[in-house]
């Protein structure tokens, strides 16, 4: 499998829109082939190579499974590494981040589980809009700035989703 792209590992074309079921099925097929148990009696070198390939498949799968990671990966394939400093230069985005974090803090302070559920539904809608926007522009070099901006926003939503999950766990206890 060598240095093939994450997409090539799974026989997929590089695209933001992926058939997640096909990706999962292909992942399971490939991982079964290199599972360490299959190489238990093999020479040490083969065991190590199988373990390395399993780790590579897992990393590729995790990257392609996540919309924000997939977006960053697609941009990196085109030579675009996202800089964190650019996020700070987007005042509207910074304001939105602050407002969402304040709202989440208020939900935590009030222990409002129903409010957290509504907040999470809004985030899911926001994520779907970002995904559609990125899918429409990532491959167009003229819209690269927009694709990078959307990918950064996806990252922010990922972090916010993680905070929401933590809050849900605390409120459920």
UniProtKB/Swiss-Prot annotation:
Residues 5-77 form the J domain. One of its GO terms (biological process) is protein folding. The keyword Chaperone applies. Keywords: Chaperone. The keyword Chaperone applies. GO terms for molecular function: ATPase activator activity; protein-folding chaperone binding. One of its GO terms (cellular component) is iron-sulfur cluster transfer complex. Interacts with HscA and stimulates its ATPase activity. Belongs to the HscB family. This is Co-chaperone protein HscB homolog. HAMAP family: HscB (MF_00682). Co-chaperone involved in the maturation of iron-sulfur cluster-containing proteins. Seems to help targeting proteins to be folded toward HscA.
